[in-house]
Amino acid sequence: MSKSHTYVLGINAYDHDVAACLLRDGAIAFAIAKERINRHKHSTGFYHDVIDYCLRAEGITLDDVDLVVRNCYVLPVGELERRLTYQDVPEILPPKERKLAPEYPLFRSRSGKVVDISHHVAHAYSAFAVCPFKEGALMVVDGVGSYAADIAEEGHRIDNLSPLARESESYYRFEGSTLEPLKKVWLEPVTGFLADEFFNMNGLGALYSRVSSYIFSDWNKCGEVMGLAPYGRANQFKSLVAFANGSLDVPEWTEAFDQPYLPEDEKWESSPGMQHWQDLAWRVQDDTERVLIERAIWLRETTGAKNLCIAGGVGLNCVANGRIVREAGFDNVWIQPAAGDDGIAIGCAYYGHLAIHNKPRSFVMEHAFLGAPYSDRDVEAAAKKWFVTVKTCHAPDDDITAETARVLAEEKVVGWFQGGSEFGPRALGNRSILADPRKAAMKDLLNARVKHRQAFRPFAPIVLAERAAEVFEGDEDSPFMLLAKRVRPEWKERIPAIVHVDGTARVQTVRREHNERLYRLLLEFEKLTGVPVLLNTSFNIRGEPIVETPADAMKCFLSTGIDYLAMHDLLVGKSRYHRLFYPVMKWGSDVATMIKVGTGTDLSRGEA
């Protein structure tokens, strides 16, 4: 390919959720997280595979890239790579990657076209640079960002601040391509030690991760905490934060919290500590919502902005997001779908495009389908497996959407694999497991046969955008499944499989122009059932990332109780012989999953 385009590459490097994003002339060409390639959730380490994925998809080499912008919240990438040459840091770079890294052109690069930026700046650019607003306010809230010593943002330095202080919250105003910092909240180190665990620090996102670690023995289970919170009793614990006049303090973890989950517990959900955990989840969720709403109101009053953008890992809390939309007073709210650290790659790329190349904003992120597409030949090759039946459907007479809608209406579970994969943690209709939401039993069936998740966790709906206000309260668009909405009373009994215990649902609205095939599937299902809603959950098995390739999809399909797999125009079923071999395949899948998640034989603590 001739060099007729300008390319900028953004990278989230080394720590959790390694990812890359490639811009072509200011528009996102491709983006991918490392976990989708190596099949290990929240993957850390070297970044060559995500870069190679994007370059291969575009048909270019690294020499064609004009600028590379990177971030690692642990240390600036350049400094970290210098240390890796003489320090033993196995959790950062395992032996295989340590051998590979020095051979890669970007490792320890001294090229002028390689730039490092700080963490919250990258989060900020990931949101405002691709939002639909010309101007507005922006909030970044996460567990932890860069060290004060590594930040060069104007207006964000404070005298006498420890160089080991970390970013916790950052607030900005933006207009066009210009980003203006307004306020930053810092985490002061507890011990002054460089490796102090962030979730022991004095911050909002850090506190939420601390509760996640306490309840689930994993700091990265914040979504599970959010799902557990509605089961808790209100105000059984006093507030975990002290928040007044815009000042936030998180008191030390108290001795009252003495019932942490231990991985050797055989039955988590029947544990005597369950009510305690539910009450604590309610408490931290309520505290988080209260602080975020007050911060958002302050930001609106300070800036006079009508539009708000949100990024950072706390931005994945769809319950808090829903309250911000309803209560903070902004006309419009846009949330980066990859609000966590995978989205750092998008922010790095756009920092390069806007701040270094000085280009104007021109791209709006209307969808998150940023993975490379797979060919029909790839799909057909993957489908040539034992114990399956394959039907080829072609529009308009034998459309895959009509055939899939038919089996869904018969209460079958369908794996749905179309187009490029979603970037970010949500399955938004290209790598999804779909089901009929009209019976509450569907939730239990999915958990028993496919997902093996905790029973308290809800499943989400996808809905035709023009019908959403009829089914759910509020008229806000929610294309990225980042808003919790109340299900209208007259619909609760019609779609019980997607209604959470508090009467809400994490809604995704679907428009024809963003996903034609998924939209048509919803139309076909509505024709058959009168319901413009489907249950949507991520296409993966417990402990694994969402499927990326046709081969990944076939593996998940064959080793679970999914009834059909719709890949492109193929509808793949299971032959009668599969029923004979399925118990053995399921046993092998369960064993592999238990090894991967490290929870012994307990199948009650699955991941989405």
Residue ranges of each PLM-predicted region?
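Flexible beta->alpha loop and helix N-cap segments adjacent to enzyme active/binding sites
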Residues: 7-8, 15-33, 38-41, 91, ...
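N-terminal phosphate-binding loop and adjacent alpha-helix
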Residues: 36-61
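Phosphate/pyrophosphate-binding loops at sites that engage ATP/ADP/AMP, CoA/4′-phosphopantetheine
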Residues: 52-66, 296-304
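Short beta-strand-loop/turn "lid" adjacent to the catalytic site in phosphate-handling enzymes
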Residues: 57-103, 107-108, 116-117, 125-127
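Short glycine-rich phosphate-binding loop at a beta-alpha junction
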Residues: 61-73, 304-313, 415
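Short acidic-aromatic active-site loops that bind/stabilize oxyanions
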Residues: 114-117, 270, 274-290, 511, ...
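A mobile "lid/hinge" subdomain adjacent to the ATP/sugar-phosphate binding pocket shared
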Residues: 244-275
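Phosphate/ATP-binding catalytic cores across multiple sugar-kinase/actin-like superfamilies
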Residues: 283-308
